[in-house]
Design a protein with these regions (language model features):
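Structural detector of coil-to-beta-strand junctions
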Residues: 15-16, 47-49, 71, 81-83
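Long, contiguous C-terminal flanking segments immediately downstream of a protein's structured core
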Residues: 60, 64-262, 266-269
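Right-handed parallel beta-helix
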Residues: 1-19, 24-26, 30-45, 56-68, ...
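Alpha-solenoid ARM/HEAT helical repeat scaffolds used for protein-protein interactions
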Residues: 46-47, 267
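Secretory-pathway low-complexity, repetitive Gly/Ala/Ser/Pro-rich segments with frequent Tyr
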Residues: 20, 39, 49-50, 85-88, ...
Length: 269
């Protein structure tokens, strides 16, 4: 069982998130159970959220906010702007021998309460365009005429595949506000954290790196808005970051760092 909640993923090319099964957990009595709720996804591109081959997944009350990179999708790919998830199957010729038992097998998905900013119809009905409309028969043996593809709507279940444990569930809109206010790996936010949160709130991409040095490679394309190659692509952000793109941290020179017993912890601690 895996739980992923109240996190933010911003300026990420793809795998937002990638629902990637593991054969050892697929083999458990109840299968691989994944609960994803109350997260915020901003300025995603590539494939966005996809996968879930043979998994059992809850996608509940997440907030999707297309950004400048997301909005570059046009034509047949425009639907990725309002993608909630693209469930799929492992192809018959998948190279992972340990996954043989689960090839050509749909997962089961409980999808409810997700909000896609700017797409009220998808917010109202997550399934029609946000999930079913994103799927294709590419990995189905026999394509669209196969029995496997004809049963692709069977991925939908009407009750959660698992409970949420001790997670408090909020509406997607409330989760958006809470995640932007509280999410993070520390109890305070540095200038880089603040920059990312500001981008999400404003719907912008402040920093974009250049991929020109790789333009001789096959399939090359320059970075989409908001995507960087290295920390220094962020710049100094008006002097709030150093030249390498990292926060400028204060140094306390008054603390004695003597460690008389050599246990790696200063005596004062």
């Amino acid at each position: 069982y895996a739980s992923y909640h109240h996190n933010i993923i911003a300026h990420c090319e793809s795998r937002v998130p990638r629902l990637g099964p593991r054969y050892t957990t697929l083999a458990l009595d109840k299968g691989e159970l994944v609960d994803i709720r109350n997260n915020v996804y901003y300025n995603y591109a590539g494939e966005g959220c996809y996968g879930g081959e043979a998994q059992k997944v809850n996608l509940v009350n997440n907030y999707y906010k297309p950004g400048p990179a997301t909005k570059l999708f046009t034509g047949s790919k425009e639907k990725r702007q309002y993608r909630i998830a693209k469930p799929d199957v492992y192809p018959k010729d998948y190279s992972g021998a340990d996954y043989k038992k689960w090839l050509q097998t749909w997962g089961r998905f409980y999808v409810s309460g997700n909000c896609v900013e700017g797409y009220s119809d998808v917010t109202a009905d997550n399934w029609q365009d946000g999930v079913f409309g994103q799927m294709d028969a590419k990995n189905c043996e026999g394509g669209e005429s196969s029995a496997l593809w004809k049963e692709h709507t069977s991925i939908k279940v009407n009750s959660p595949v698992s409970g949420a444990g001790h997670v408090t569930t909020h509406s997607a809109v409330d989760a958006y506000d809470m995640v932007l206010q509280y999410a993070g790996a520390c109890n305070y936010r540095d200038k880089l954290d603040e920059l990312i949160i500001s981008d999400v709130r404003k719907g912008v991409a402040t920093c974009t790196g250049s991929a020109k040095e790789w333009e001789s490679l096959k399939g090359w394309s320059d970075n989409k808005p908001g995507y960087i190659n290295k920390p220094s692509d962020i710049g100094t952000n008006a002097g709030q970051l150093d030249e390498k793109g990292f926060p400028v941290l204060a140094t306390d020179t008054e603390i004695c760092t003597e460690d008389t017993d050599s246990d790696g912890i200063p005596d004062y601690w």
